[in-house]
C-alpha cells in the first residue's frame, strides 16, 4: 500500500521540465482574471495575476479552494451549485497522506463541509483511513471515492461513510469516471506505462455483499494514456461520447481522447474532471496548491475551473510534454 501510494504521489509531479508556452488569444468566455476567481485568494501566492495557458479562452469561471493547510485536490464532482473535492494532505509525511473530502459552493467559494480524515472499515475488518483520494464520482448511490486499494461510498450531504470495499490486485484506484451506462471506471495510474480503466456496475457492487472487488467482477476495460491523472465520459468536438483523459504534470496539461482524435492543450496540473450538461467541463488542478506553489515555478491557476467546451473541435494541440 505504501509503495503504491509513493508511486501515486510521484505521479502527480511527473516530468516538470516542459512548461506550457504561449496562451490562446481567440474569443470565448475567458480567459478570466485574478479578480474573477470566486472565494478567498490563497495567502501563500506571491502574485495576484493568473498565468495564461493554451486554450484558456475557454475558462469561464474559477474557484479558490482552501489549500493553504496542505490540501491537494485530486477528484471532483459538481452538481447544481455544489462541488465535492477529494484529495490528500500534501504537508503530511508520505505514509500519512490520508484522504480529505470537502464540499464547496461554487458560486461563492465558501466551504460547506469537510471530512478529514476519511475513515471506516471493510466489513468487520480492522478500522482504517483512506489514502490519496485520487478519484471521485457520483451516481444514484452517492459519492464514490476511489483510492489506491479501496473504494468508498459516501453520503453527499452529510459526508458520512456508508460502506467500504477493498480493491483486490491487480486493481488499483488512481482516478475514476462514470460512463454512459452509469458504470464506474476505476483507473490505474502507471508512471511509464499506459493506464487502464476497469468498469464496474455499482448496483452489482452494492447488492453483492462482497467485501473485495475483484477483476472478475469487471464488465470490461479501456486503455488510457501514460500519465493519466483523471478521466471524464464526454461527447466532445462533435464526436460520440467516449472517455477522455487528463495527462498532466504541474506545468503542463493535455486532454487525450479516442485513438483517432488529436490531443488538446489543457489545464496545467489537471486531475479530476466532471462534465455538467453538454458544454461545462469542471476541472481540478493541483498546480495552484500550496504544496506545489512553494516548490517554485508552477503556474498560478485556480484549483477549480469551469471550461466551455462548445468550441472544442478548434482547440489547439499541446505544445508541452508530460
How does the language model describe each region?
Residues 93-102, 150-155, 192-203, 242, ...:
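Structural motif
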Residues 8, 12-64, 299-322:
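Sequence/structural signature of beta-propeller modules
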Residues 59-99:
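Beta-strand-rich domains and repeat architectures in extracellular enzymes and scaffolds
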Residues 85-86, 145, 186, 245, ...:
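Residue position within the beta-strands of beta-propeller blades
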Residues 72, 100-102, 109-140:
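Blade-loop segments of beta-propeller domains
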Residues 80-81, 140-141, 181-183, 236-241, ...:
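Short coil/turn segments that connect the beta-strands within blades of beta-propeller domains
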Residues 68-75, 126-135, 168-179, 223-234, ...:
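Repeated scaffold domains used in trafficking and secretory/extracellular systems
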Residues 215-259, 263, 271:
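Loop/turn-rich, solvent-exposed surfaces of beta-rich toroidal or solenoidal domains
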Amino acid at each position: 500500500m505504501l509503495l503504491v501510494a509513493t508511486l501515486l504521489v510521484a505521479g502527480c509531479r511527473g516530468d516538470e521540465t516542459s512548461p506550457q508556452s504561449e496562451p490562446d488569444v481567440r474569443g470565448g468566455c475567458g480567459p478570466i482574471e485574478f479578480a474573477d476567481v470566486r472565494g478567498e485568494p490563497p495567502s501563500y501566492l506571491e502574485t495576484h495575476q493568473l498565468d495564461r495557458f493554451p486554450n484558456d479562452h475557454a475558462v469561464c469561471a474559477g474557484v479558490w479552494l482552501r489549500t493553504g493547510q496542505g490540501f491537494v485536490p485530486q477528484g471532483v464532482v459538481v452538481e447544481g451549485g455544489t462541488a465535492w473535492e477529494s484529495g490528500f494532505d500534501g504537508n503530511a509525511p508520505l505514509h500519512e497522506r490520508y484522504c480529505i473530502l470537502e464540499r464547496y459552493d461554487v458560486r461563492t467559494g465558501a466551504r460547506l463541509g469537510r471530512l478529514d480524515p476519511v475513515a471506516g472499515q471493510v466489513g468487520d475488518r480492522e478500522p482504517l483511513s483512506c489514502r490519496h483520494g485520487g478519484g471521485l464520482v457520483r451516481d444514484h448511490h452517492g459519492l464514490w471515492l476511489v483510492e489506491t486499494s479501496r473504494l468508498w461510498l459516501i453520503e453527499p450531504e452529510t459526508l458520512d461513510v456508508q460502506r467500504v470495499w477493498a480493491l483486490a490486485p491487480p486493481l488499483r484506484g488512481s482516478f475514476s469516471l462514470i460512463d454512459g451506462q452509469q458504470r464506474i471506471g476505476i483507473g490505474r495510474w502507471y508512471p511509464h506505462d499506459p493506464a487502464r480503466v476497469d468498469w464496474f456496475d455499482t448496483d452489482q457492487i452494492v447488492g453483492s455483499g462482497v467485501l473485495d472487488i475483484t477483476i472478475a467482477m469487471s464488465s470490461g476495460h479501456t486503455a488510457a494514456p501514460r500519465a493519466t491523472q483523471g478521466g471524464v465520459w464526454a461527447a466532445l468536438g462533435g464526436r460520440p461520447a467516449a472517455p477522455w483523459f487528463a495527462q498532466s504534470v504541474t506545468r503542463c496539461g493535455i486532454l487525450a481522447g479516442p485513438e483517432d482524435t488529436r490531443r488538446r492543450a489543457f489545464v496545467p496540473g489537471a486531475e479530476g474532471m466532471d462534465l455538467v450538461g453538454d458544454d461545462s467541463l469542471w476541472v481540478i488542478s493541483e498546480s495552484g496548491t500550496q504544496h506545489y506553489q512553494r516548490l517554485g515555478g508552477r503556474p498560478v491557476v485556480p484549483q477549480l475551473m469551469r471550461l466551455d467546451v462548445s468550441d472544442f473541435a478548434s482547440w489547439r494541440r499541446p505544445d508541452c510534454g508530460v
